[in-house]
């Protein structure tokens, strides 16, 4: 008897980040994007200008898939914006 109902295809997402972070921190930032409404223009500029040297792939949960679908292609940019905000907080 096949286990079709139990074998759901897992989706992966790859992000290009300007700072090297682990999967746990990436997931944390991704979940923070769930409630994002607006982005500071200066933060956005820094995120766009930053060199994205690091590539990180994760297998998405159902919740994360919904977040990615809602944000579309802007998800990667918004993740980098969150990283910029974290860096600004660490320096202050």
UniProtKB/Swiss-Prot annotation:
InterPro entries: MJ0366-like (IPR024254), Ribbon_hlx_hlx (IPR010985). Disulfide bonds: none annotated. One of its GO terms (biological process) is regulation of DNA-templated transcription. It holds the Pfam family DUF2540. It comes from the Archaea. This is Uncharacterized protein MJ0366. The lineage of its organism: Archaea, Methanobacteriati, Methanobacteriota, Methanomada group, Methanococci.
């Amino acid at each position: 008897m096949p286990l079709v109902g139990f074998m759901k295809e897992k989706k992966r997402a790859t992000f290009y980040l300007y700072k090297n972070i682990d999967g746990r921190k990436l997931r944390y930032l991704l979940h923070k994007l769930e409630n994002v409404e607006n982005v500071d223009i200066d933060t956005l500029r820094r995120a766009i200008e930053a060199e994205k040297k690091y590539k990180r792939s994760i297998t998405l949960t159902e919740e994360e898939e919904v977040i990615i679908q809602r944000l579309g292609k802007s998800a990667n940019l918004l993740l980098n914006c969150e990283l910029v905000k974290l860096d600004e907080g660490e320096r202050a």
